């Protein structure tokens, strides 16, 4: 019985990955150059636990579950992000993970799309 359940999960995630890769594109990729935090004009400044390409297994699974389509597999996405405020009093003020600017932050920090790494200079 366990073998059937694990086979079902494996087929589900394989199908999910195939659907994500075969879906038409919707968002444009962002340049990967590191920019100063003061010039974060591509979106909001975020502190993400993980920053990955959209085609990575964990990012592709989340994008598929949320029904999000991205243009190109080289788009950077941030996973489990918190905002960094200009004043430094937000929940992400002490960013020890990856500070990024992200264009699409509509998923309450679960996943942010179109991210560009930044240099906080702290």
UniProtKB/Swiss-Prot annotation:
InterPro entries: Hydrophobin. Residues 1-22 form the signal peptide. Disulfide bonds join 40-101, 47-95, 48-81, 102-115. Keywords: Cell wall, Disulfide bond, Secreted, Signal. It is found in: Secreted; Secreted, Cell wall. SMART domains: HYDRO (SM00075). Its main location: secreted. Pfam families: Hydrophobin (PF01185). One of its GO terms (cellular component) is fungal-type cell wall. One of its GO terms (molecular function) is structural constituent of cell wall. Induction: Expression is low during in vitro infection of pine seedlings. It comes from the Eukaryota. Belongs to the fungal hydrophobin family. Aerial growth, conidiation, and dispersal of filamentous fungi in the environment rely upon a capability of their secreting small amphipathic proteins called hydrophobins (HPBs) with low sequence identity. Class I can self-assemble into an outermost layer of rodlet bundles on aerial cell surfaces, conferring cellular hydrophobicity that supports fungal growth, development and dispersal; whereas Class II form highly ordered films at water-air interfaces through intermolecular interactions but contribute nothing to the rodlet structure. Self-assembles to form functional amyloid fibrils called rodlets. Self-assembly into fibrillar rodlets occurs spontaneously at hydrophobic:hydrophilic interfaces and the rodlets further associate laterally to form amphipathic monolayers. This is Class I hydrophobin 2.
């Amino acid at each position: 019985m366990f073998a059937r359940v694990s086979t079902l999960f494996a087929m589900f995630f394989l199908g999910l990955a195939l659907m994500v890769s075969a879906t038409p594109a919707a968002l444009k990729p962002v340049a990967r150059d590191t920019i100063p935090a003061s010039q974060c004009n591509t979106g909001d400044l975020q502190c993400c636990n993980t920053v990955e390409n959209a085609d990575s297994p964990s990012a592709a699974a989340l994008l598929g579950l949320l029904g999000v389509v991205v243009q190109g597999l080289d788009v950077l996405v941030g996973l489990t992000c918190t905002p960094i405020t200009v004043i430094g009093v937000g929940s992400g003020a002490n960013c020890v993970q990856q500070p990024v600017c992200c264009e699409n932050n509509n998923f309450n920090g679960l996943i942010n799309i179109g991210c560009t790494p930044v240099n906080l200079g702290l």
